[in-house]
Amino acid sequence: MLVVVSPAKTLDYESPLATERFSQPEFVEHSAELIEVCRKLTPADVSALMKVSDKIAGLNVARFEQWSETFTQENARQAILAFKGDVYTGLDAETLSDDDFDYAQNHLRMLSGLYGLLKPLDLMQPYRLEMGTRLANERGTNLYQFWGNIITDKLNEALNAQGDNVLINLASNEYFKAVKPKSLDGQIITPVFKDCKNGQYKVISFYAKKARGMMARYIIENKIDSVEALTRFDTAGYYFVEEESNAKELVFKREEQN
């Protein structure tokens, strides 16, 4: 079972590291190509392109300038520990064990606009470049065209290496659009998390993002290797709803939160 999640805009390069182990990202040459494009952008360009404040634009122009093709523990940290935000609050990687990190390294992948696809312990320098950014480059007008089949091919490698063909999609639509389902050597299953609000069950973004992280952790901690086992996910009050689920979607619901 392979799990994919989105990255996060919020980053943490200050907190103590939960593990000293690390690996190197695989697509540095591709990332360097994007960095060269980004280095031609002014702060005003970045602000308009990414729809961010002048302050955040300035920060990211500086990040593009400082980015290096050499990744060390001085200029980078493990992706699973660098990303913060709702998904990663649910995942809570800081409290994973060494065995958990081993399992995650083989079974979890993070999609990324700049890095393409990251293993949890891959070193990552700070950046902001969302997959939906319409950044013109030599391969096309956006990052989906830039990455093409590269991400899907690497996911196929990971699926084949672990011996089954199930991919659990815990990523957002923006990021999963970088995967080409027709070229994927596996069955895609997308968990859907619905929370009760005013008597109605619906996807509430904040809760759904956190739930994706909690499910990723559940898979890692329990070494989940079947869809049937995944339906027993019950973290934070979620429960599986078989009658609303199908071969492509697993629906989980939760009662209203006070």
Swiss-Prot record:
Secretion signal, residue range per the UniProt entry: none
Stored Pfam families: H2O2_YaaD (PF03883)
GO cellular component: cytosol
Transmembrane segments: none
Biological process terms in GO annotation: response to hydroperoxide
HAMAP family assigned to the protein according to its UniProt record, in alphabetical order: UPF0246 (MF_00652)
NCBIfam families tied to this protein: PRK02101.1-1 (NF002541), PRK02101.1-3 (NF002542)
Family: Belongs to the UPF0246 family.
Protein name: UPF0246 protein VS_0505
Organism: Vibrio atlanticus (strain LGP32)
